[in-house]
Regions:
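N-terminal cap/lid segment of alpha/beta-hydrolase-fold proteins
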Residues: 24-65
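Hydrolase active-site cap/lid region
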Residues: 27, 158-209
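Short beta-strand element of the alpha/beta-hydrolase
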Residues: 67-76
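The serine-hydrolase catalytic nucleophile loop
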Residues: 77-89
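Conserved alpha/beta-hydrolase
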Residues: 90-109
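Alpha/beta-hydrolase active-site loop
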Residues: 112-136
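Alpha/beta-hydrolase fold nucleophile elbow
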Residues: 136-150
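Serine-hydrolase catalytic core
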Residues: 209-283, 287-289
C-alpha cells in the first residue's frame, strides 16, 4: 500500500498576517537539540533516479532512532536560494530533509524543461515512498512532507493536485506558470530576469521556457487546482513579489471551494524572504508541530 504523502510549503497560522514574526521562536530555530550518541544527526550526498538520470541530492538525517518523517525541499528556478537554513531548522525538529536538483540543473545530468521538473518531483516522492529507501535511512514512508518555494511551490501544488495520496500541500511565493505570458509588461520583466539567471540550467532558454508554459497555460494555472485540493490541508505563504496576485487568487479560489483546512499568510518581504529568514524558519517549524498534533507525529 502506498504511504500517505503530505506536501507542505512554508505557511503561518490560520488567517492572513502581514507580519508573521512570533513573540518567541521555537527551540528548533534557536538552539541545538540533545544529541543521541547512538543515532546522531548527519548529512550525506545521494542520488535520486528520474528517467534514466541520477539527480544530485543532499540528505540531512535527523538525530534519534526514528523512524523519522522526511521533508522534500523543492527549490526554485534555477534555485539560487536553496533554503538550507530551513533544512537545518526542520532537521532540528526531528525530520529528515532531502534537497535535490532537477535534471539539467546545478550539475545534474540531463536537459531541463518545466515538464521534466514536474516528472522529477513525482520521482522524488516515489523515491521517498520506496521501502528500501525508508529502511536504509530510518524513514517513515507514510510521513513525507514537501516544501516548495517559487518554482518549487508550483511543483508542490501540481504534484498534490495529481496525487490522491497527498493529504496536505503548501506553497511558498509560487510562480503561476499558467499566467506568466498573460500580461505583456510583467512577461517582459520576468523574461529579462530569467535570461540573467539561467547559467546553472542546461538545455533550456528563457524564451523556450515561456513558450513551453504558454502551451500548457490552462493546466498550469494553479488557481484551477483549487477543486482538486479542496479535501486537503492547504498551506499558503506569499511575499511582496511578482507572484503576489496569483497567490491571492489561489487563496480566494480555495476558500470558495470550501477547502477543509486553509492556512494563509502574507509576509512583507522580497521573493527570497531575505529579511525574514528567522520568521520563515519559525513558521515552518510551528507548522510541522501543528501537523504532528493532527496525527502526522514524528517518532523521536
Amino acid at each position: 500500500m502506498r504511504g500517505s504523502i503530505i506536501m507542505f510549503a512554508v505557511v503561518g497560522l490560520a488567517g492572513v498576517s502581514a507580519q508573521p514574526v512570533p513573540a518567541q521562536a521555537p527551540a528548533a530555530v534557536v538552539a541545538d537539540p540533545p544529541v543521541d550518541p547512538k543515532f546522531p544527526p548527519g548529512v550525506t550526498g545521494i542520488t535520486v533516479p528520474s528517467h534514466g538520470v541520477d539527480m544530485d541530492a543532499t540528505l540531512y538525517l535527523a538525530g534519534g532512532a526514528g523512524p523519522h518523517g522526511t521533508v522534500l525541499l523543492l527549490h526554485g528556478l534555477p534555485g539560487y536560494e536553496h533554503n538550507g537554513d530551513l533544512a537545518q531548522a526542520i532537521r532540528r525538529v526531528g525530520w529528515n530533509v532531502l534537497l535535490f536538483h532537477y535534471r539539467g540543473t546545478w550539475g545534474t545530468a540531463g536537459q531541463f524543461s518545466l515538464s521534466s521538473a514536474i516528472e522529477d518531483t513525482a520521482d522524488a516522492v516515489r523515491f521517498l515512498r520506496d521501502p528500501a529507501t525508508a529502511a536504509k535511512y530510518r524513514m517513515d514512508r507514510e510521513r513525507v512532507v514537501v516544501i516548495g518555494h517559487s518554482f518549487g511551490g508550483f511543483l508542490a501544488g501540481y504534484e498534490a493536485s495529481h496525487d490522491p495520496d497527498i493529504k496536505a500541500v503548501g506553497i511558498i511565493a509560487a510562480v503561476n506558470l499558467g499566467k506568466i505570458n498573460a500580461d505583456p509588461k510583467e512577461k517582459e520583466e520576468r523574461l529579462k530576469r530569467w535570461e540573467a539567471q539561467l547559467h546553472p540550467i542546461r538545455g533550456a532558454t528563457a524564451p523556450g521556457l515561456f513558450s513551453e508554459a504558454e502551451r500548457h497555460a490552462k493546466e498550469w494555472d494553479y488557481v484551477h487546482w483549487a477543486d482538486a485540493l479542496r479535501g486537503r490541508q492547504v498551506l499558503l505563504v506569499e511575499a511582496d513579489d511578482q507572484n503576489h496576485t496569483d497567490m491571492e487568487a489561489l487563496a480566494a479560489a480555495l476558500r470558495e471551494k470550501g477547502t477543509i483546512a486553509l492556512d494563509h499568510e502574507a509576509v512583507s518581504t522580497d521573493h527570497s524572504f531575505s529579511d525574514h529568514r528567522i520568521a520563515l524558519q519559525t513558521i515552518v517549524v510551528k507548522w510541522l508541530e501543528k501537523l504532528n498534533a493532527h496525527g502526522v507525529a514524528d517518532k523521536h
